[in-house]
Amino acid sequence: MTGSPLPARERAIVLRKERLGGDHVRLVLDAPQIAPWTRAGQFVHVLCPTEASLQHFAEAKGRVLAPGSRLADSSHFPLLRRPLSVHRLCGPQYAADRLRAGPHSPSTTSWPRRCSGLELLLRVVGSGTAALAEREAGMGVDLIGPLGNGFSIAEEGQEAVLVAGGIGVAPLLALAQELRLLGRPVTALVGALDLARMPLGVDPQVDRSFADDQLEFMLREFGEIGVRSVLVSEREHGMLVTEYLERFLERKRHEPLVLYACGPKAMLAEVARLAGRRPCQVLLEERMACGVGACRGCVVKVRGEGRTRFRTVCKDGPVFRAQDVLWEEMQ
């Protein structure tokens, strides 16, 4: 279910920028038009170009560019907006001590929420994200949002299990906030190539806790809101997060669980397989242009009403039921 009736375009203001491990950057933004309506799993479409790149584009417009010239290389023109999941919401309702205590009265969980800030977590991979990572406190960021359909919240009595791979952890922190606001028990299983590239704060006892197979408050951002977590490092532990998930599900085989996942497609396909008949929602990440379903550049095949259908990740998703996605068709 989407948040606001219509997405808003807003010039959000950067309140703080944090450089994290592995080329990750966290931007804390003041976005009073978008933040109160944002639901976990939704995204904002961000205009990333620097003023310099736009100036170069304006100067080049209307003339033929020589092949091989710097301005002819489209990588220097991050003109398309970048879809970025909302990482965390900021406001009195989302204070860490309140989320640890949860649940809250219906009046505090209705829409719009009493918050005006949101956080974006990004990994610098190209010219667009590099330009966005250059924003400093006081500078503006052009956003459209909230966009897409977010997560459906676990029913009372179900434990929510969040499974993240790499930068896929970004939208799951906002989901953890939402679940804790309603008092749901939450466990986060987070996979990373190595500990140094983890974009969240890591407890120094992570290796001991992993060896003891104990779920502790190992990731700071999850722990401070009452979510137990385990960090699985492929390099340090020689294990994928899906392998740990299989072990975890075996221990919890008689307990009511609902799974949520975001990460590489191969990881999501394996999470869907391991989930079996358990309810499981996945957030898909696709390249997209318009962000509103018009260009149909981000379609995926899903099962629906007895036949295969094409759905857009930006408008129909980015969250889908794992059992509906035709994983064998995913590239």
Could you tell me what each predicted segment is?
Residues 312-316, 322-331:
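SAM/dcSAM-binding transferase cores
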Residues 103, 203, 242-249, 294-302:
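Short, surface-exposed amphipathic charged segments that create phosphate/polyanion-binding patches used
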Residues 127-289:
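FNR/FR-type flavoprotein reductase catalytic core
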